[in-house]
C-alpha cells in the first residue's frame, strides 16, 4: 500500500503485501493485490533481518524508514545483490533465532508484556432462544473447561493439543487478517475495523457483513453468571458512577468500586494503557473469587470461534489492541482486553473450530509466544513464535495415550528462560551462572580485621530493617505462630527448671527458669540480629550445672557465687569472640556438621517425649493380671510411716503434728500426702492408690496430639474448603490441637498429669535473693580460677548458638533482611552475664524450637493460577512473635488458673511433633533410607546422578557414626564435653577430603536446595544434548543488547549449516503432507473452506 494512502484509524500499514509474503507454499494472500518486484521485496528483507531496528515509531501505523532504495523499481546493482543474499539467508533462519531477535528488541510503553488471562467463547444456539457467546474454557496458566453439564468448571489440567489443529492455526494466521496495535474503544468499533479489513481481502456482501457483525456483537454468557431468579443483582457500573476512568483492580474484595476521587489514576494504570472510558462494567456479574487469582495489571486475551450459516468460508482475524481496552461484558473478569482472535466459519465444522481456538488460547499462555505476541511488528513474527512453539512441543504417540485423559499440573514448571537466550557460535547456549554450591560465604561472615568490625557491619545491616520487623508482624500467621510456640516453649522451660531444682537443691528452680527465659528472650527479640532464633535451655548446660554443684558441695563453696564468676568470665570471653570476628569461623560448618547436630537434637526431642510418657507409668502404673474375683478385697489406706526419714520428722516437728493422735486411716489422699503419711494395701502404688485409666488416657492424648497436629498442618494442601480456611487451619494447627485436647481431657475427667506453674513470683529458696555476689563467702582466688570452666562453657555457648544460627540462615529459607552472627552472640553474652548475677539459668539458641519457628512463618504466593502450586517466597521475618512468646512466658505466673488445665501428655505430643517435623528436609535421613531400597526404586535425588551409590553410603555411614558418638557422649556423664565433640565434626569433615573428591563432596555436602540444584542439573544435561545435536554457524553477526548478551542477527551468513541433523521447522513444515493439504485447500476457490 503506498505510504501516502489513507487507512482507517486502527488498521496498521504494516500489512503491506511485501510483509505478507510468508515463505511457504504460496498460500499467502495480499491485501490489495499489489505486487512488488523481487528486488524490492529482497531489499526490504535484507534491511529488516540484517539491521537491528528500533521500536520507536513515527506513528501508530508502524512504518519503518527504508529509504529511497526500498521504493526503487529496477536496478540490479549492489542493492539487489544484497537483497538476494538476504532473501536466501532469511529462508534458513530458525524460529528460535527469529524469536530471540524479536525478544531482544527494545521495549516501549505500549508493548510491555503483562500477565494474560485467556478466555474461549463459542457461539451457542438454544431452541427458542437467541444465539449468544458462551464461555467454554479459560486459561490463566492451565486449562479449565466448562463441563458438559454446564454447571461447574473442570479441574485445571495441562492442555493437550493435536498437531493438526496447530497446523490449522498457523494456516489461519497466514491467510487471515493480522491487525496489530489497533486503536479502538469498543467491540463495535473493533468489529467494524475487522470487517473493513476482510473486505480488502475478499468480496464480502452487505448481508454477510451485517450477519457477521451481529454475530460478533451478540451477548456473552459466562460460567459464573448462574441463574439468579431468586436474587436481585445490584447493578453498579462505571457508567452509573460517572463513567470515570478507573483501573479494574481498584475494586475491593466485596465488589465495591473505589471512587475516582479516592483512587486517582496511578502511573501503572497509565503505563498499562487501560482505557476504561465509556466502558460500563457490571460488577455484579464479575467473578470476584476468581479475580483474586489474577495478578494485578493482568490483561485479557479473548478467543472467539463459532459457526455462522451465511458464511461460505472462514473469517479469521488476530487483533492486538493498543492500548488495552476494558470491553464491557466480553470477559469473565473486568480486566482490559489486549488480544482478540476471531474465527467464524461455515456450519458443520464446530469441533474443528473449537480445537483451533483451544490451540490459540493455549499458545497464548506459553511464556515465549506471549512475549512475542506483545512485541511482534508483523505477521512473520507471530508465525516465528508459533514455529518456535512447535519446535519445543513433545509428541505423545496416538496408540499409547488417550487424549481425553487430563494431565494433572506439575508441582514445578521448568523455567523457559533458556528458550529466550540466544545461541553462540560454538553451539552452546548462554545461561545464567549458577550460584556457588554450599558454604556460608557472604558479607556477614567476612573477617574485617578491625576490632568489633563484624558487629558494626551487623548493626548497619539490620538497622534499616528494624521498624519493618514490627510492621511485618501484622498477620494472622504471626498470631498462630506465637500461640503455638508459647505452649511449646513453656513446658521445656518449666521442666528444665524442675530438673535444675532437683540438681541444685532448689537454688535454681522453675520460677527462676521462667524469669530467666522471659528476660533473656525479650532482650534477644528486641536487639538480636536474627530474631527468628528462639532461645531455650540445653542438655549440656544442665550437665554442667550438676557437675558444678557437686564440686561446690564437695569443697564447701557457694554454688551461686562461683556460678556467677563463671558466667561473667564466659560473657567476657564471648564478647572477645565478637570483637575478633570469631563468628567468621562459622563458614567451616558445612551441611555435614549441621545435619549431624540438628538430627541429634531432633532425635533427643523424640526420645525424651516418648521417655516422659513411659515414665508416667511409675506414678500411674498399670494394674496387670488383676484378679477380678478378689476385687472386693482390694484396699488402700493411709497409715503412720514405720520408719520415717529425717525430712518427715523435721516436718512433723515444725508443724507440731501429734502423730499418735492422728486418725491416719480416715485421711484423704491429699491430706495423707501433705502429712507425709504412708499408703498401705493391695490397691496402692508407689505414690498412692491406683488411679485407673490415667496411663492409657495419657497415651491417647499423646498420640492424638501428634496425629491431629500433623494432619491439620498438611490441611493447606487438602481439597476441602476454600483456600483462606485451609491456610488459617494450617497456621493454627498446633494451637487448635492443644485447645481441642484440653477440652476433651476436661470433658472425660480422667485425672491426667497437668502442667505445674509457680503461682508466686519470688525465689524458690528464702536464703537467696535476686542478686548474687560473684565472690560471696568463697575465697578470692575462685574469681580467677573460674576462668578455667568458663573456657569450656564458652565453647558450649558458641557452638550451640552459631550452629543453630547457621541452620536458620540457610539459603533455602530465602531470608531478605540479612543475618547478624556477631550481634546475636553479643546479646547472648550480655544476657548470660546478667542471668549469672541474678542467679538465673543460662539460655542459648534452641535448635528444634528455632526450626519450628521458621517453619511456622513460611510465606507462599497468594495469587496463584488454578492448578499452579503456590511458590515459596521466604520467611516472614519479624521480631514480634519471639517478643510476645517471652512476654507471655513472664506473665505465666499470673495465669496459673488457666495453664493448670493443660495435660502434660499433650505437651509431650507437641514435642514429638516438633522433633518429627524438624527432621523433614534433612538430607541425612533421605540418604539413610537408601540402604534398604533397591536401586530401581530409589528416588531421583540429585546427588545420585553424580556420586556413585557406594560413595553415598560411605558418606552416610561416616555421618551416622558421628551421630551415634554424639548420642553416647550426650547420654553419658561426660556430656560436658559434648560441644567439643560437635567442634570435632568440622575436623572429621576435613579428613573426608582424603576419601572423596571435591566434586562428590560438592553434591553431598552443601546448602543448596534440592529443587534448585536439580533444575540446574537438568538444564545442563539438556544443554549438553543440544550441543551434541546442533552446531550454530560461527560467522553470524552480533548485536549488543541491553542484557549485554550477543544475539545472532537473522538473515545473514546463517544459510550454511555445519550439522546436517539441524533442521529449520519453518522449512520442514511445508514438506509435510498435512501442511501441503492445508495449503492446497487454502489456495482453492473461495467457495471451499480451508479446513477440509
Curated annotation (Swiss-Prot):
GO terms for MF: bicarbonate transmembrane transporter activity; chloride transmembrane transporter activity; identical protein binding; sodium ion transmembrane transporter activity; sodium,bicarbonate:chloride antiporter activity; sodium:bicarbonate symporter activity
Effect seen on changing residue 800 to C: 40% of wild-type transporter activity. No effect on cell membrane localization
Effect caused by changing residue 804 to C: 20% of wild-type transporter activity. No effect on cell membrane localization
Reactions catalysed according to its record: 2 hydrogencarbonate(out) + chloride(in) + Na(+)(out) = 2 hydrogencarbonate(in) + chloride(out) + Na(+)(in)
Glycosylation sites: 646, 666
Cytoplasmic-side positions: 500-507, 587-595, 709-731, 800-824, 903-904, 984-1092
Disulfide feature: 636-684, 638-672
GO terms, biological process: basolateral protein secretion; bicarbonate transport; chloride transmembrane transport; modulation of chemical synaptic transmission; positive regulation of synaptic vesicle exocytosis; regulation of intracellular pH; regulation of membrane potential; regulation of synaptic vesicle exocytosis
Pfam families from the UniProt entry: Band_3_cyto, HCO3_cotransp
Consequence of substituting residue 496 to C: 40% of wild-type transporter activity. No effect on cell membrane localization
Result, substituting residue 970 to C: 60% of wild-type transporter activity. No effect on cell membrane localization
Annotated keywords: Anion exchange, Antiport, Cell membrane, Cytoplasmic vesicle, Disulfide bond, Glycoprotein, Ion transport, Membrane, Sodium, Sodium transport, Synapse, Transmembrane, Transmembrane helix, Transport
Gene3D superfamilies per the UniProt record, alphabetical: Helical hairpin bin, Mannitol-specific EII, Chain A
Membrane topology: Multi-pass membrane protein
Superkingdom of origin: Eukaryota
Compositionally biased residues, Basic and acidic residues: 243-255
UniProt-annotated stretches for the region Disordered: 1-26, 55-95, 243-263
Main localization of the protein described in the UniProt heading: membrane
Extracellular topological domain: 1-478, 529-565, 617-687, 753-778, 846-881, 926-962
SUPFAM superfamilies from the UniProt entry: Phoshotransferase/anion transport protein
GO cellular component: apical plasma membrane; asymmetric synapse; axon terminus; basolateral plasma membrane; dendrite; glial cell projection; glutamatergic synapse; hippocampal mossy fiber
Effect ascribed to mutating residue 612 to C: 40% of wild-type transporter activity. No effect on cell membrane localization
Family of this protein: Belongs to the anion exchanger (TC 2.A.31) family.
Function, as annotated: Mediates electroneutral sodium- and carbonate-dependent chloride-HCO3(-) exchange with a Na(+):HCO3(-) stoichiometry of 2:1. Plays a major role in pH regulation in neurons. Mediates sodium reabsorption in the renal cortical collecting ducts.
Quaternary structure, from the entry: Homodimer.
Protein's recorded name: Electroneutral sodium bicarbonate exchanger 1
Source species: Rattus norvegicus
Amino acid at each position: 500500500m503506498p505510504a501516502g494512502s489513507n487507512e482507517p484509524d486502527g488498521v496498521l500499514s504494516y500489512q503491506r503485501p511485501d510483509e505478507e509474503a510468508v515463505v511457504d507454499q504460496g498460500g499467502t494472500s495480499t491485501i490489495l493485490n499489489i505486487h512488488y518486484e523481487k528486488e524490492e521485496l529482497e531489499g526490504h528483507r535484507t534491511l529488516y533481518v540484517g539491521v537491528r531496528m528500533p521500536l520507536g515509531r513515527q506513528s501508530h501505523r508502524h512504518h519503518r524508514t527504508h529509504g529511497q532504495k526500498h521504493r526503487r523499481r529496477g536496478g540490479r546493482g549492489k542493492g539487489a545483490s544484497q537483497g538476494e543474499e538476504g532473501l536466501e539467508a532469511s529462508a534458513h533462519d530458525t524460529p528460535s533465532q527469529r524469536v530471540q531477535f524479536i525478544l531482544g528488541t527494545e521495549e516501549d510503553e505500549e508493548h510491555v508484556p503483562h500477565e494474560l488471562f485467556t478466555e474461549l467463547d463459542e457461539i451457542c444456539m438454544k431452541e427458542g432462544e437467541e444465539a449468544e457467546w458462551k464461555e467454554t474454557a479459560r486459561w490463566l496458566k492451565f486449562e479449565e473447561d466448562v463441563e458438559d453439564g454446564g454447571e461447574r468448571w473442570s479441574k485445571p489440567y495441562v492442555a493437550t493439543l493435536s498437531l493438526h489443529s496447530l497446523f490449522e492455526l498457523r494456516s489461519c494466521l497466514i491467510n487471515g487478517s493480522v491487525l496489530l496495535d489497533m486503536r479502538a474503544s469498543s467491540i463495535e468499533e473493533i468489529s467494524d475495523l475487522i470487517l473493513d479489513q476482510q473486505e480488502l481481502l475478499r468480496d464480502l456482501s452487505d448481508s454477510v457483513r451485517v450477519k457477521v457483525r451481529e454475530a460478533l456483537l451478540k451477548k456473552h454468557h459466562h460460567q459464573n453468571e448462574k441463574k439468579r431468579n431468586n436474587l436481585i443483582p445490584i447493578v453498579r457500573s462505571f457508567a452509573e458512577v460517572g463513567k470515570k476512568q478507573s483501573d479494574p483492580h481498584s475494586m475491593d474484595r466485596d465488589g465495591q468500586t473505589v471512587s475516582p476521587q479516592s483512587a486517582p489514576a496511578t502511573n501503572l494504570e497509565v503505563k498499562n494503557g487501560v482505557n476504561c472510558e465509556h466502558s460500563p462494567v457490571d460488577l455484579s456479574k464479575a467473578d470476584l473469587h476468581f479475580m483474586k487469582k489474577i495478578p494485578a495489571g493482568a490483561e485479557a486475551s479473548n478467543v472467539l470461534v463459532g459457526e455462522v450459516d451465511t458464511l461460505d468460508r472462514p473469517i479469521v482475524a488476530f487483533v492486538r489492541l493498543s492500548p488495552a481496552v476494558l470491553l464491557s461484558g466480553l470477559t469473565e473478569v473486568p480486566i482490559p482486553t489486549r488480544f482478540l482472535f476471531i474465527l467464524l466459519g461455515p456450519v458443520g465444522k464446530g469441533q474443528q473450530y473449537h480445537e483451533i481456538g483451544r490451540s490459540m488460547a493455549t499458545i497464548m499462555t506459553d511464556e515465549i509466544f506471549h512475549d512475542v505476541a506483545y512485541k511482534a511488528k508483523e505477521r512473520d513474527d507471530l508465525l516465528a513464535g508459533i514455529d518456535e512453539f512447535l519446535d519445543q512441543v513433545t509428541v505423545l504417540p496416538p496408540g499409547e495415550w488417550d487424549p481425553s485423559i487430563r494431565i494433572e499440573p506439575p508441582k514445578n514448571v521448568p523455567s523457559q528462560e533458556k528458550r529466550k537466550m540466544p545461541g553462540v557460535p560454538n553451539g552452546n547456549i548462554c545461561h545464567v551462572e549458577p550460584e556457588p554450591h554450599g558454604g556460608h560465604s557472604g558479607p556477614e561472615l567476612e573477617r574485617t580485621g578491625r576490632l568489633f568490625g563484624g558487629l558494626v557491619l551487623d548493626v548497619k545491616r539490620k538497622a534499616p530493617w528494624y521498624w519493618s520487623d514490627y510492621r511485618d508482624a501484622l498477620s494472622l500467621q504471626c498470631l498462630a505462630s506465637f500461640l503455638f510456640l508459647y505452649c511449646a516453649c513453656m513446658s521445656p522451660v518449666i521442666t528444665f527448671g524442675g530438673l535444675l531444682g532437683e540438681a541444685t537443691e532448689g537454688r535454681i528452680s522453675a520460677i527462676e527458669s521462667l524469669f530467666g527465659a522471659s528476660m533473656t528472650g525479650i532482650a534477644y527479640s528486641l536487639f538480636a540480629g536474627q530474631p527468628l532464633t528462639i532461645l531455650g535451655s540445653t542438655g549440656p548446660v544442665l550437665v554442667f550445672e550438676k557437675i558444678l554443684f557437686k564440686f561446690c558441695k564437695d569443697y564447701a563453696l557457694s554454688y551461686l557465687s562461683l556460678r556467677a564468676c563463671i558466667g561473667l568470665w564466659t560473657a567476657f570471653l564471648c564478647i572477645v569472640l565478637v570483637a575478633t570476628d570469631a563468628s567468621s569461623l562459622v563458614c567451616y560448618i558445612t551441611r555435614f556438621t549441621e545435619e549431624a547436630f540438628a538430627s541429634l537434637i531432633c532425635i533427643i526431642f523424640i526420645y525424651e517425649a516418648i521417655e516422659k510418657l513411659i515414665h508416667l507409668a511409675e506414678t500411674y502404673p498399670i494394674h496387670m493380671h488383676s484378679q477380678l474375683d478378689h476385687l472386693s478385697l482390694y484396699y488402700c489406706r493411709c497409715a503412720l510411716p514405720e520408719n520415717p526419714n529425717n525430712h518427715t520428722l523435721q516436718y512433723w516437728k515444725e508443724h507440731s503434728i501429734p502423730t499418735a493422735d492422728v486418725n491416719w486411716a480416715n485421711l484423704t489422699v491429699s491430706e495423707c500426702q501433705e502429712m507425709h503419711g504412708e499408703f498401705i494395701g493391695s490397691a496402692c502404688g508407689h505414690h498412692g492408690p491406683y488411679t485407673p485409666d490415667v496411663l492409657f488416657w495419657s497415651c491417647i492424648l499423646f498420640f492424638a496430639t501428634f496425629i491431629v497436629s500433623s494432619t491439620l498442618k498438611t490441611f493447606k494442601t487438602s481439597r476441602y474448603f476454600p483456600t483462606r480456611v485451609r491456610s488459617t487451619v494450617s497456621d493454627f494447627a498446633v494451637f487448635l490441637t492443644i485447645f481441642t485436647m484440653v477440652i476433651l481431657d476436661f470433658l472425660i475427667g480422667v485425672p491426667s498429669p497437668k502442667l505445674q506453674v509457680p503461682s508466686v513470683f519470688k525465689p524458690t529458696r528464702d536464703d537467696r535473693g535476686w542478686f548474687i555476689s560473684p565472690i560471696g563467702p568463697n575465697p578470692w582466688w575462685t574469681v580467677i580460677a573460674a576462668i578455667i570452666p568458663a573456657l569450656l562453657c564458652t565453647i558450649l555457648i558458641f557452638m550451640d548458638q552459631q550452629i543453630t544460627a547457621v541452620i536458620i540462615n540457610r539459603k533455602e529459607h530465602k531470608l531478605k533482611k540479612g543475618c547478624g552472627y556477631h550481634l546475636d552472640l553479643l546479646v547472648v553474652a550480655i544476657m548470660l552475664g546478667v542471668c549469672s548475677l541474678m542467679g538465673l539459668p543460662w539460655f542459648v539458641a534452641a535448635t528444634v524450637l528455632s526450626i519450628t519457628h521458621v517453619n511456622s512463618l513460611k510465606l507462599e504466593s497468594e495469587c496463584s493460577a488454578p492448578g499452579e502450586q503456590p511458590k515459596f517466597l521466604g520467611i516472614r521475618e519479624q521480631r514480634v512473635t519471639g517478643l510476645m512468646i517471652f512476654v507471655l512466658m513472664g506473665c505465666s505466673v499470673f495465669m496459673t488458673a488457666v495453664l493448670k488445665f493443660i495435660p502434660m501428655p499433650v505437651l509431650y505430643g507437641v514435642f514429638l511433633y516438633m522433633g518429627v517435623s524438624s527432621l523433614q528436609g534433612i538430607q541425612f535421613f533421605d540418604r539413610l533410607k537408601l540402604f534398604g531400597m533397591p536401586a530401581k526404586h530409589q528416588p531421583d535425588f540429585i546427588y545420585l546422578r553424580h556420586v556413585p551409590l557406594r560413595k553415598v553410603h560411605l558418606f552416610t555411614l561416616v555421618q551416622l557414626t558421628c551421630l551415634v558418638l554424639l548420642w553416647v557422649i550426650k547420654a553419658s556423664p561426660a556430656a560436658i564435653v559434648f560441644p567439643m565433640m560437635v567442634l570435632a565434626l568440622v575436623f572429621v569433615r576435613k579428613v573426608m577430603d582424603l576419601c572423596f573428591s571435591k566434586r562428590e563432596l560438592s553434591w553431598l555436602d552443601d546448602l543448596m536446595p534440592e529443587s534448585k540444584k536439580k533444575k540446574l542439573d537438568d538444564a545442563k544435561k539438556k544443554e549438553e544434548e543440544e550441543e551434541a545435536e546442533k552446531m550454530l554457524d560461527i560467522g553470524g553477526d552480533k548485536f549488543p543488547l541491553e542484557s549485554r548478551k550477543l544475539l545472532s542477527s537473522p538473515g545473514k551468513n546463517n544459510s550454511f549449516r555445519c550439522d546436517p541433523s539441524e533442521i529449520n521447522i519453518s522449512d520442514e513444515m511445508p514438506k509435510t503432507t498435512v501442511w501441503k493439504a492445508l495449503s492446497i485447500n487454502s489456495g482453492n476457490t473461495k467457495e471451499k473452506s480451508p479446513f477440509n
